[in-house]
Structure formats: structure tokens, C-alpha cells
């Protein structure tokens, strides 16, 4: 091909006509071949012709396009760092130094029915938008222009990348060295090459953004996690957490009111069990609240596990409550208002037996009647009033009530000692258990965070940084000692 040719007046007029035609939009037909709105019939080129530069009669392509084609396609280039520019194949390990050899190699990876060809050069692709951007380069159409300089490009992505050259903020930095760059892809290459760790990502204004995470071994461009913003431009994370806290506190306040209205003694273990579904309800009410950036759990599964645990424990609780109701029916006397009753009334008449009640706490042991006998001055039967120590000894030795939990191997009796003593109940076990590490969690949030570190394909591969561990011990030490941004 010739590099530069002598121009004639006829050729100048033909070039003006060509530029006018190139300004018209390009449409594609069913065969994905571009057609110009001109008087000449468009034709598709054979595959053999694609390997050679396009040579026409001068009315379609001028000498400048031929020279540009030689420079861009056939000649290797040197980048800004003084190294030869290479083109790497994403499907294999092939590396080319010219566009022409790279396009010829891509033919083996693209199916014939999906291959899109350019009529003006050997360019091929399987994506329509790539062909559209390529044709814009041929036409000289670059609608995206920089407002700070004369730079123009064919798509928005290239403009966004160019705008970083006008900024002095290096958003992406290395945690283990002084490496800093403006581009996420460059940081990923650095981290993979030297096995370094990524720190916190900066915003465009230089402020730290803990919500954006670098997926070192991922193929997707940019940070992995994005958060929606409200009208004011603030992240919805804090508002969702506050909303969940308010809803959770509202549910906690509703349980004591329910107990007071029903006057049903509830064991402390049932209060803890009643709080189990709150976590799943919080995430159902606030679906946009992110729990862990590496995990997308189905919280309906957690709710189903909680309901299954409650269904197994509920028969034991119902039996305990039925036994309490039967004991209350055996007592003919009704309890008075707790506000008016004292702890123990020793001045009552023999005909009016007094009952033992609690002002702040409900009765936890079996209900029974205390008969107080007053000594009579008229007879000599020797009846004496029971001492307070005897009454207290009877209160301290009721028949213990056992609540069997299906998740524990042994049963723990509920022993009542006094009003201020707390009832010890063995906590629920194995509700949230990691089968990979053989670790149990009492709280669903801790269990969810832990499971987020397990990989999808390899359970002992860290989902945060990509490090692969040998066994459960090495994996646990890794997530406990190594910092994850």
C-alpha cells in the first residue's frame, strides 16, 4: 500500500463528497453488514479479502485512511512506558503485537454465525456495540468530548477513564507498599503480581469509602459492591440500621405488655425463643440493608430454621404452662392486686388465709397455700404461729420443673431461690452451626458473617481475598488474623 499520494482537484472533491456521506448514520441489515446511504451498491467482502487492506476506486477510501490503517493495524507500537504494546487474548494465552494478528487469532474463538465483520478493515467481533464503536472511528464520529481539553472519544467509558487524568486523586492504593493508581484494573494487576492486599478505596473527592471493595481475582470491572443512594446522596446503610434497631426495640417492648395482659407466667427461656424470628423480620422489612458484602443469603431459609426450632421446643413449653394452669385451678383463693399485697401478711385472721405473691416478678414455683395458725389465749392446745424460717424453707424447696430442650443432651431444672435470684437456663445450642468448621454460633448475625467468608466452589477458599487454606484450622486462623477491607 502507498503511504502518501499526490492529491488532485478531482480527488479533493471526491474527499468532500466522502466526508458528507460518512456523516450519515450507519445501519446494519440481517447479515450484520454496514450499508451507506449512497448511490453505489453495497456489497459484502469475502473472508479472504478481509486479510488484505481494502482497495477501492478512490471514491470510498483515500490515501490518508490507507496510511492510518498501516500504522494502526500492521505496525507494532510503543506505549508511554517505552515498552511494546501487546494485545492479550481473553480466551487463551495468545499475545499479539499488532492488531491485524490479534484479529486473525480471534477468528478461532468466534463462531461463524456470531462473527461481525467490518467492511473497511479486517476487524471482527461478536459484539454489536464493539462494531459500532469501531465504525465511529472510521467515520471520525466521536460524540463524547472532554470539557477541559480537546479530547473526544466514541463511548462514555473512555471519557470517564480520560477524566481521571485531570484529577490529582489516586483512588486505588496498595496496602503493603506505596503503589497508587487512578485505575482499578491497574491495582488488580499489581495485587495479583506481588500478592499484596487492597486497602480502603477512596471516592472521587479523596474521602475514604469503606463500602467499596476490590475483588482482586474477579473479572468484573471496578469495585465489587455498589450501594444505592437517596435524594441527598447519602448511603442508605445507616438509615436502614437505625430502622432495624427501632423495629427490633419495638418488638421487644411489645412482649412484656402481652405478658401483663394475659397474666400467664412465662419461663425466661421462652422469652429468648420468642426473639428468634426478629432477625429475619428485620431483613424482610429492610431488604436494602447489606449484612455482608461477600454474601447474598436467602433469609427465608434462616427464618425456616428458626420456625423449625420453635416447633420442636413449643410442646415442652406448652406442657409446662398447662401444669402451671392446673396448679392455679387447685387453689380456690384468688390473688389480689399485686400493688396492694405485701410480701407476707402475718397479721391476718385465721379465717382469711394469706397468699404469697411477688410485686415485681411472677411466681416461678408450684402454687400452694400457707395456713397460719394463731395461738388462742382461751384454750391450752399449744398451737403456735409458724416462724418465718419455716415458711421460707418451704418456699425454697418446691418440686423443680424440668424443661427439656431438644438441642441439649442434658436437662437443666429451673430452681427458684428468691425474688432477686436469676433462673439459669442452659442456652440453645446448634441452632446456627457451620458444618465446614464445626463451630456453633448463638447469634444468627455472627453465623452469617462467618459463612460469608467461605467460598462457593471451595469452602476453604476465602471469599474476601481469594486465599486458599488447607483445612478448617488454617481457614479459621486466616479470617481471624488477616485483615479484610
From Swiss-Prot:
SUPFAM superfamilies: beta-beta-alpha zinc fingers (SSF57667). InterPro entries: Ikaros_C2H2-ZF (IPR050589), Znf_C2H2_sf (IPR036236), Znf_C2H2_type (IPR013087). Residues 1-77, 229-270, 318-361, 398-422 are annotated as: Disordered. Residues 16-37, 257-270, 345-358 have a biased composition (Polar residues). Residues 59-72, 325-335 have a biased composition (Acidic residues). Residues 402-416 have a biased composition (Low complexity). GO terms for molecular function: DNA-binding transcription factor activity; RNA polymerase II cis-regulatory region sequence-specific DNA binding; zinc ion binding. A zinc finger (C2H2-type) spans 87-109, 116-138, 144-166, 172-196, 432-454, 460-484. The keyword Repeat applies. GO terms for biological process: regulation of transcription by RNA polymerase II; segmentation. Its main location: nucleus. GO terms for cellular component: nucleus. It comes from the Eukaryota. The keyword DNA-binding applies. Belongs to the hunchback C2H2-type zinc-finger protein family. Gap class segmentation protein that controls development of head structures. This is Protein hunchback. It comes from Clogmia albipunctata. The gene is hb.
